[in-house]
């Protein structure tokens, strides 16, 4: 880019955006299906996919934030009134918070239930705490409302 003002989002920013959306479109119905299934091989398979997709969304969101920090975003519409630009910035911030909250709470719910999680580059297991697991499950479900 020859100037310091971006006229549109880069192809990588667009990729992060649309890939995250596609993962969420797959992820949310899987979560609703999981709560209706009894324990079975099908439930384990769907839950494993749900966890892998969730951890992927977590990493993609972190990459998006790092990329956003080091790259230029297009300027907001100068003709828009101040409140509209402020709302746009707050909306982006809230979506990042919601994405990180829903993924982090899902991860912590699994870990406090005594399960070991594979984070692609390392495995993690912590001491069981079922009360905390229930609290993180509630946060996980409630944060879905804000996506």
Predicted feature locations:
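Membrane-embedded alpha-helical bundles that constitute the cytochrome b-like, heme-associated redox core
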Residues: 1-145
